[in-house]
Structures are given as C-alpha cells and as structure tokens.
Curated annotation (Swiss-Prot):
Protein name from the UniProt record: Asparagine--tRNA ligase
Gene that produces this protein: asnS
Coiled coil: none
NCBIfam families, per the entry: asnS (TIGR00457), PRK03932.1 (NF003037)
Family (UniProt): Belongs to the class-II aminoacyl-tRNA synthetase family.
Source organism per UniProt: Salmonella typhimurium (strain LT2 / SGSC1412 / ATCC 700720)
Organism domain of life: Bacteria
Any one Pfam family match given in the protein's UniProt record, by short name: tRNA_anti-codon
Lineage: Bacteria, Pseudomonadati, Pseudomonadota, Gammaproteobacteria, Enterobacterales
EC number from the UniProt entry: 6.1.1.22
Length: 466
C-alpha cells in the first residue's frame, strides 16, 4: 500500500488492482439505497476528484461515513479499479476510510457545495483555494511560474534576487510604500522641521520596491543575462480589476541587447509558457474554457501560432486616428495609449499580438534610451488580443551624459542614483530588458477578469486582511 496523489490515480499512473491510499477532502457524498456511498475526494493535485466507492460493511460506515460532508478531510485506502461510470476512467474500491477532520457545522461552512460569487470568495480568501475556480488558478499560477524559470534557465539566464527594500524609485512616479521603524506618535524632526530619517532604521528614507530592474541591470552588466522574479509594491490608490498594491513581477535584463533583441525574447518567452500551460494543465484549462471564458484555450493556441506584429508608436497613433472609431480617450501624438487603444490595435487592426515601440520620451521613464530624433525613446509594449499591454520594456540608456540629462529633465537627483550611474562609467554596454506583471499574465491565460482572484491574498486600497 502506498500513498499517491489523486492525479496519479485518475491519469492511469497507478496499476489497476493496486492498493493505494489517497488523502484529501470531501467534495460531495452520494448514498445509494443499496448501502453504498460514493465519496468525491480531491487533494488539489489535479482538477477532478477521485470517486471512492464505500460499502456499508465498513465498520465505521454508519457512525462516520454517512455523516461526512463537504470539506471533511479523509484518508481513503482501497484498490484502484476501472470505473464503470461516465466522467472518469478509474475509481477506488475503499477498504478503509479514516476521518482526519470534521467540518464543525456543515450548515455554516463557508465553502458548502454550492456556487459562490467571486466577490464572496474574496471575503473568505483563506478558504477559497478549496473551490474549483481558485484551485485551478493556483495550479495554473504554479505551472506558469515553473515554465518561466525553465525558459530562462534553458536560455542561459541567471536568476537574481533583488531587494524588496530600496531607497530608489525606479519608475520616478513616487507611488511607493515607506518602510520605517520611527515612532509615529513621536517623530524626530530636523532643523527645518522635517522628519529626520537619519534616526530611522536605515539612516535614510526607505521604501518597498516598485521594480527590481535597476538592481537587475547591475548583475546583467556582469553576468550578461539575468532575470528577477518576485513581489513588487505600488501605492496607487486604484480600485480596478487590473491593479494590486502587491503583485509579482518578472524582469529579464540582457547585456549587449537592443530593442529588437528585447522584442524577440518577449515573444519567445510568452509562447513557451503558453505552450507549457496547454500541455501540462489541460484539465484546468478545460474548466476555464467551459466555465469562465469559452475562448481561453483557443486564445492561447492562436497566440502561440501567430507571429508578433511590430509598429512604431507614431504609426500606431496614425492608425488609431484614421480608423473611424470613437474612443473614450482622445488619440494624439504624445498621449499614453489607453487599454481601448491597445486592444483596438491588437484585436481589430493587426488581429495578432503586437509590439508598439519608440514612444515619446515625455511619457516614459528616465532610464529608457533616447533615440536619434531626440523626441522618442527605445521603449516597447507588447499588446495581446483580449487584454492590451502584457509586457513593458526598453533598451536602457547606457550613455552617462544622456542619462544625466534625462534625470535633470525629470527632476531627479542624480546623486540618489550614483551607483546606477557607475554602470555607465565603468565598461558601459547597450542592454535591454522588460517587465511582465505576473498576475496580468495569469488573468490572460485563465480568462479570470480581476487580478484579485489570481493571487492568493490580494492587497488593495483599504484591504490587507489575512
């Protein structure tokens, strides 16, 4: 007898007539008049539960088995047999059922066997992984993360752990969470009456990172190809389906790479991870296509078989101005494209993923390489049909004098970035990279509309429960 995951039983990795033990939770119990009960037992290893067939001859049948309800945890031992019923190939003829844990009051159990609204599930985020939806999201999230690591490892990249606490604002937007151990009831003040951060833990103002990019660049300029993957934080007071205060970001950085290299890397990476999900999570993707977004599988299949289009920002604006469509947000050269503009380009004009590049410098970050025209920077956004922007990146400014001028234009103190500037003083090289919001990627793959439902415990304005 061996303990096996439910997935091994259902996917035929266990021989018929072999005795096994599965451990998990009851999804449903059905009793027949013939004195047989059918337990659907899941353990999270795959989408479907395994059916355990339990005869009333078991010694604890009346006292325990007949009282099992949704959510009870059980240890079931029995023989794997071919299932005569429709829906699954194998089931377990139980010879022993142990109850590991009861649900105290089945009538008040938040995850009782009925459909719950997605909004309700956010209120019980500690229990929602037990649902079909959130369980499937969690497995897809895992598969995407593993596929990203695999892709970069196979491409010769090194994973670099960049700090979560920083003194630098990568985006220059100032929407950062402050990290401090100062007594808020008795803040130290300097001669000017301002808070004296010299007395703080780090001896200066410190924040939660908005990006690992600047730190990542330092390692790319020594190891050639690196990526960072971890949590990032934005103190944006945005209550939308696309924003989180804490989210995960993947950021590769490559030395001796220009914007074209960057675009090729982004395309190869996305196609790799989408193929991985289609191959490795077929059961979960089938659920998403049936219950969440009927286009979920077909969208990914189209994506991996389609070449990316490319268009300059200037030409993209011209396309939008000439298209005859009325947008909520006006289109003109110099405007940051909104989601409706991005989706029109990807879904209606190009009908394919599209890389928009060479944006006006005024709407992009200080570290993006200034183009020869002096008006645009070597920035790119990857737009995907169905969602809009999914990746943002650029070739970085490797020329110290130009970088300093851009910082001055944007009102940044170059002394705060002394170490970043050093990269341009000691063996500078062209280099490029991009950022991928991991939760937006998961939302795109699954068809789940709100990023709050693809991260285990969402952090949003006025919400840091659990």
């Amino acid at each position: 007898m061996s303990v096996v995951p439910v997935a091994d039983v259902l996917q035929g990795r266990v021989a018929v007539d072999q005795e096994v033990t599965v451990r998990g939770w009851v999804r449903t119990r059905r009793d027949s008049k013939a004195g047989i009960s059918f337990l659907a037992v899941y353990d999270g290893s795959c989408f479907d539960p395994v059916q355990a067939v339990i005869n009333n001859s078991l010694p604890n049948y009346n006292e325990e088995v007949l009282h099992l309800t949704t959510g009870c945890s059980v240890v079931v031992t029995g023989k794997v047999v071919a299932s005569p019923g429709q829906g699954q190939s194998f089931e377990i003829q139980a010879t022993k059922v142990e109850v590991a844990g009861w649900v105290e009051d089945p009538d008040t159990y938040p995850m009782a066997a009925k459909r719950h609204s997605i909004e309700y599930l956010r209120e019980v985020a500690h229990l929602r992984p037990r649902t079909n939806l959130i369980g499937a999201v969690a497995r897809v999230r895992h598969t995407l993360a593993q596929a990203l690591h695999r892709f970069f490892d196979e491409q010769g990249f090194f994973w670099v752990s960049t700090p979560l606490i920083t003194a630098s604002d990568t985006e220059g937007a100032g929407e950062m969470f402050r990290v401090s151990t100062l007594d808020l009831e008795n803040l130290p003040r300097n001669d000017q009456g301002r808070v004296d951060f010299d007395k703080d833990f780090f001896g200066k103002e410190s924040f939660l990172t908005v990006s690992g990019q600047l730190n990542g660049e330092t390692y790319a300029c020594a190891l050639s190809k690196i990526y960072t993957f971890g949590p990032t934080f934005r103190a944006e007071n945005s209550n939308t389906s696309r924003h989180l205060a804490e989210f995960w970001m993947l950021e590769p950085e490559v030395a001796f790479a220009d914007l074209e290299d960057n675009a090729r890397l982004a395309e190869a990476m996305l196609k790799y991870v989408f193929n991985a999900v289609l191959e490795e999570r077929a059961d979960d993707m089938k659920f998403f296509a049936e219950r969440v977004d009927k286009d979920a599988i077909a969208r990914l299949e189209r994506f991996v078989s389609t070449d990316f289009a490319q268009v300059d920002y200037t030409d993209a604006v011209a396309i939008l101005e000439r298209c005859g469509k009325t947008f909520e947000n006006p289109v003109f050269w110099g405007v940051d494209l909104s989601s409706e503009h991005e989706r029109y380009l990807a879904e209606e004009h190009f009908k394919a993923p599209v890389v928009v590049k060479n944006y006006p410098k005024e709407i992009k970050a200080f570290y993006m390489r200034l183009n020869e025209d002096g008006k645009t920077v070597a920035a790119m956004d990857v737009l995907a049909p169905g969602i809009g922007e999914i990746i943002g990146g650029s070739q970085r400014e490797e020329r110290l004098d130009v970088l300093d001028a851009r910082m001055a234009e944007m009102g940044l103190n170059k002394e705060d970035y002394w170490w970043y500037r050093d990269l341009r003083r000691y063996g500078t090289v062209p280099h490029s990279g991009f950022g991928l919001g991991f939760e937006r990627l998961i939302a795109y793959v699954t068809g789940v509309q709100n990023v709050r439902d693809v991260i285990p415990f969402p952090r949003t304005p006025r919400n840091a429960s659990f």
